[in-house]
A protein has these predicted regions:
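Conserved ABC ATPase "signature" region
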Residues: 31-34, 40-58, 167-168
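Conserved ABC ATPase signature
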Residues: 63-67, 71
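Conserved catalytic motifs of ABC-family nucleotide-binding domains
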Residues: 84
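A short, surface-exposed alpha-helical micro-motif characterized by mixed small hydrophobic
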Residues: 130-132
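Short, glycine/charged-rich "phosphate-handling" switch motifs in NTP-dependent
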Residues: 136, 148
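Short catalytic/signature loops enriched in Gly
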Residues: 150-184
Length: 184
């Protein structure tokens, strides 16, 4: 099961061991799960997924502290995808990044999804990110799933009161829309 389902963590700073090189960080799942026969095969898979995640070969020799937040998140994504999972949980995977880097990581995730045929469960509190990346949305309230629908349908016509309140709280650039947030 671990090979087929993987996780991208929220904080790329905390998710990477400062004592390991990027090569070793990405290779670790292959070695722990016994998915390669030797170092050459491991290195080939590491180089392949690093390139797909827009990491240069020179990056593989460095340590995590040498990278920006976006680069660290790409390293985390490479580590997640190196064992070729079918299902990936992205737990607030862009929340710690600034907006321009968020867009870059979201575009990378979408291209990897298309290229590798992945299914993502994208956990986020940022509804603009959810609207951009998700095909289907589920809303939780107090630990309970209260609504689930295709993204456009949920955003255009929410049925649960919490979903309505959540969507009404999204800031608007239209001055006529101010003050319309619903209270629970």
């Amino acid at each position: 099961y671990r090979k087929l389902a993987q996780l991208i963590f929220q904080d790329p700073y905390a998710a990477l061991s400062p004592r390991m090189t990027v090569r070793d960080i990405i290779a670790e799942p292959l070695e722990v799960m016994g998915l390669t026969q030797n170092r050459e095969e491991t290195d080939e898979k590491v180089r392949e997924i690093a390139a797909k995640c827009r990491l240069n070969l020179e990056h593989l020799r460095r340590f995590p502290h040498a990278f920006s937040g976006g680069q660290r998140q790409r390293i985390s994504i490479a580590r997640t995808l190196v064992c070729n999972p079918n299902f990936v949980v992205a737990d607030e995977s862009v929340a710690a990044l600034d907006v321009s880097i968020q867009a870059d990581i979201l575009n990378l995730l979408q291209s990897l999804q298309d290229e590798l045929g992945l299914t993502f469960m994208f956990i986020s509190h940022d509804l603009s990110v959810v609207a951009h990346i998700c095909d289907h949305v589920a809303v939780m309230y107090l630990g309970t799933l209260v609504e689930s629908a295709p993204t456009r349908k949920l955003f255009d016509n929410p049925s649960h009161p919490y979903t309505k309140a959540l969507l009404s709280a999204i800031p608007s650039l239209d001055p006529d829309d101010s003050g319309k947030a619903q209270k629970l």
